[in-house]
């Protein structure tokens, strides 16, 4: 079998940097899927992505599609011919679909009789004849939310397409993709190298593009180069570069030929809280800040240029000139904000609407203050500090700094509170109230901050659900899913003794008559318990384990978590499958029992197997009660796992629905007690 390397490059206008990597990997995945569907073998697929191009290279692609045998079974012979032996319409229709006559069909004998069958060999095509459609289909399936048209073309893509190159070895694959004919022309860097050049062979890519076009097409190569050179620059300046993965990938997507440079800003700007300066450098300018070994911001930053002049002075000075006004603004806002205390900004919160039916930010602040105090009492935090932090929680939204640099909310509140002489725990809580901000983010460190963070999240959840605006589909304008998961993480990971139902009731009471949803408490609790499912699935915990616990609807998150861990452990035990099946059987029996079931009467036991099970469940009921009270569900289920033998023996030797009513009721009581033991932890009958 002969093979060749295949190259496809799509040359475009500048692609959206935050979408570039996803587009490239999806393109490669789609090409792979199309090749597999066509039955074409290959060794490996490589993807390339730069601001003005997407490319895929398939290594050792078979140049010929293999032939394949197909079988199409038709009707049974008994149904294919009438009494006179003539083909029926069903047989003729099937044969016509196969491109044959009924007489040309073969017959196959099965244990269900004889059937008509058509066997045919489909000859494989040369790979070059298939590639145009394969590429077109792969591009059509890219995740492009808002495709665009350009010029007078009717085709759509994420950005205008200027060049298409498809090569199988040294052979140009002719065809048209997105309205552009395939050619050997490849565009180089916009400012460096050759603007256009020809490529003769797929093997020349991406090396030729780097040599002639000054473009590093390999995304991961550019990324590694930027990272290494940035770290080296920072080390040379006596610091460490702050290089977040998301920003690194965005910068990688912005340049074709990275040139890593360092620049500086005036030291007097360091009097401004570092978070505001970093927000400007990272968010607006895509710079990497530099910190010293103690974590203090240095007056230097690293940036990545897309051009590489012999003397970079002009580029460095240009970037310093660009960032200076932004830092000057931050400095001005900070100094201006310090002239008014946070607490004095409270009245202005009355001018900002939180939600039309739920009132202003001042109303929300008042509710957070009260709820934070209640939560603080329950978790052993300082109530006065929690209420003070709740009162000040939204005041920094009224500052110039946060108005201009919105992502600094919370952290600027902390700095301003420190300047105002507020307690340190109160100040820190103003920042940590928004934690966790995203999946995997750190949690509030102090209990005071945890109380405020929970109060804020529960106020939003209760309020929005209370006016009937629960999230629908992917729409979640108030980020309720994030709020719910954040609240659960705080309660579970800090093992706080809080109950969801109690918190929602307390939160709802603070809204007065503003809430219209009479089922708000149940709705919020169910919504939050539902978020557990996504959380645990991400951890690799089986869905049936989560469902087993959800069936009991425990509303204390820390308790819910303990049950999930216990059931997940129980599921690994040898006796788990048998006991789960037995519990299903017990559930079915009890569901049909109808009348109320009393207590076990040991003296009424007749069979040895029923007496053994009765004694075992009664003994365990007493033994596990203190463990249930302690929340030690793992030990409880370990002990209940020992019931497998007596349960199996019971079902093997005892007829539950005995004719004697007293005997039947006692046996139902045994099963009811057995089920009750497990239900104190979870409904294990749902385990698969």
UniProtKB/Swiss-Prot annotation:
State if Hydrolase is listed as a keyword.
no
Print the keywords alphabetically. Aminoacyl-tRNA synthetase, ATP-binding, Cytoplasm, Ligase, Nucleotide-binding, Protein biosynthesis
| GO MF term set | arginine-tRNA ligase activity; ATP binding; glycine-tRNA ligase activity
Q: Which Pfam families match?
A: DALR_1 (PF05746), tRNA_synt_2f (PF02092)
Query: What general EC class does the enzyme of this chain belong to?
Result: ligase
Q: Looking at the keywords, is Transcription regulation present?
A: no
Per UniProt, subcellular location reads as: Cytoplasm
Enzymatic reactions: tRNA(Gly) + glycine + ATP = glycyl-tRNA(Gly) + AMP + diphosphate
Q: Which GO terms describe its biological process?
A: arginyl-tRNA aminoacylation; glycyl-tRNA aminoacylation
The EC number of this protein is: 6.1.1.14
GO cellular component terms given for this protein: cytosol
NCBIfam families reported for this sequence: glyS
Complex formation? Tetramer of two alpha and two beta subunits.
- Family, similarity comment: Belongs to the class-II aminoacyl-tRNA synthetase family.
Q: Which PANTHER family match?
A: GLYCINE--TRNA LIGASE, CHLOROPLASTIC_MITOCHONDRIAL 2, GLYCYL-TRNA SYNTHETASE
Q: What is this protein called?
A: Glycine--tRNA ligase beta subunit
Q: Which organism is it from?
A: Haemophilus influenzae (strain ATCC 51907 / DSM 11121 / KW20 / Rd)
Lineage from the top down? Answer: Bacteria, Pseudomonadati, Pseudomonadota, Gammaproteobacteria, Pasteurellales
């Amino acid at each position: 079998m002969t093979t060749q390397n295949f190259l496809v490059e799509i040359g475009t206008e500048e692609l959206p940097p935050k979408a570039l990597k996803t587009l490239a990997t999806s393109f490669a995945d789609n090409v792979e899927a199309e090749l597999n569907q066509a039955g074409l073998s290959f060794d490996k697929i490589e993807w390339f992505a730069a601001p003005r191009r997407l490319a895929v290279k398939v290594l050792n692609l078979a140049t010929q599609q293999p032939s394949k045998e197909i079988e199409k079974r038709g009707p049974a012979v008994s149904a294919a011919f009438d009494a006179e032996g003539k083909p029926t319409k069903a047989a003729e229709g099937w044969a016509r679909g196969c491109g044959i006559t009924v007489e040309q069909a073969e017959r196959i004998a099965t244990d269900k009789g004889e059937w008509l069958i058509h066997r045919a060999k489909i000859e494989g095509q040369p790979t070059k004849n298939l590639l145009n459609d394969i590429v077109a289909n792969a591009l059509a399936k890219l995740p492009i939310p808002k495709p665009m048209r350009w010029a007078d073309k009717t085709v759509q893509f994420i950005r205008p397409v200027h060049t298409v190159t498809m090569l199988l070895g040294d052979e140009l694959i002719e065809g048209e993709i997105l309205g552009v004919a395939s050619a050997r022309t490849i565009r180089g860097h916009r400012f460096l190298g050759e603007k256009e050049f020809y490529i003769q062979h797929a093997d020349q890519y991406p090396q030729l593009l780097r040599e002639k076009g000054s473009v590093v097409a390999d995304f991961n190569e550019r990324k590694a180069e930027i990272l290494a050179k940035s770290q080296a620059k920072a080390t040379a300046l006596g610091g460490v570069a702050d290089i977040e993965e998301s920003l690194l990938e965005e910068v990688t997507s912005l340049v074709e030929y990275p040139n890593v440079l360092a620049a500086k800003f005036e030291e007097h700007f360091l009097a401004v809280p570092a978070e505001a300066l970093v927000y400007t450098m990272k968010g607006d300018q895509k710079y990497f800040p530099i910190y010293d070994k103690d974590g203090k911001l240095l007056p230097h930053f690293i940036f990545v240029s897309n051009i590489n002049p012999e003397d970079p002075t002009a580029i460095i000075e240009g970037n310093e000139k660009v960032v200076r006004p932004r830092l000057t603004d931050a400095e001005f806002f900070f100094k201006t904000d310090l002239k008014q205390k946070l607490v004095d900004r409270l009245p202005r919160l009355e001018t900002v609407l939180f939600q039309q039916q739920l009132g202003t930010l001042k109303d929300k602040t008042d509710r957070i203050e009260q709820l934070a105090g209640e939560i603080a009492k329950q978790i052993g935090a300082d109530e006065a500090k929690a209420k003070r932090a709740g009162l000040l929680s939204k005041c920094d939204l009224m500052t110039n700094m946060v108005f201009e640099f919105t992502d600094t909310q919370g952290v600027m509140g902390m700095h301003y509170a420190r300047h105002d002489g507020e307690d340190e725990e109160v100040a820190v809580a103003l920042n940590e109230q928004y934690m966790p901000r995203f999946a995997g983010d750190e949690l509030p460190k102090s209990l005071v901050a945890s109380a405020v963070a929970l109060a804020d999240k529960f106020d939003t959840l209760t309020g929005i659900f209370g006016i009937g605006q629960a999230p629908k589909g992917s729409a979640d304008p108030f980020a309720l899913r994030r709020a719910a998961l954040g609240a659960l993480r705080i309660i579970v990971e800090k093992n706080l003794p809080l109950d969801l139902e109690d918190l929602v009731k307390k939160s709802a009471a603070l809204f007065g008559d503003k809430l219209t949803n009479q089922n708000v408490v149940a709705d919020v609790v169910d919504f939050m318990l539902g978020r557990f499912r996504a959380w645990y699935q991400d951890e690799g915990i089986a869905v049936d384990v989560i469902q087993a616990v959800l069936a009991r609807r425990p509303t204390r998150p820390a308790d819910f978590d303990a049950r999930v861990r216990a059931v997940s452990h129980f599921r690994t035990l040898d006796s788990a499958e048998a006991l789960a099946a037995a519990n299903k059987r017990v559930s079915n029996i009890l569901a049909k029992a109808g009348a109320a079931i009393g207590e076990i009467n040991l003296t009424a036991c007749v069979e040895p197997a029923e007496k053994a099970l009765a004694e075992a469940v009664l003994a365990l009921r007493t033994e596990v009660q203190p463990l249930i009270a302690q929340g030690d569900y793992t030990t409880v289920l370990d002990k209940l796992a020992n019931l497998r033998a007596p349960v199996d023996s019971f079902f093997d030797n005892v007829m539950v629905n005995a004719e004697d009513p007293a005997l039947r009721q006692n046996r139902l009581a045994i099963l009811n007690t057995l089920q009750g033991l497990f239900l104190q932890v979870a409904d294990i009958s749902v385990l698969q």
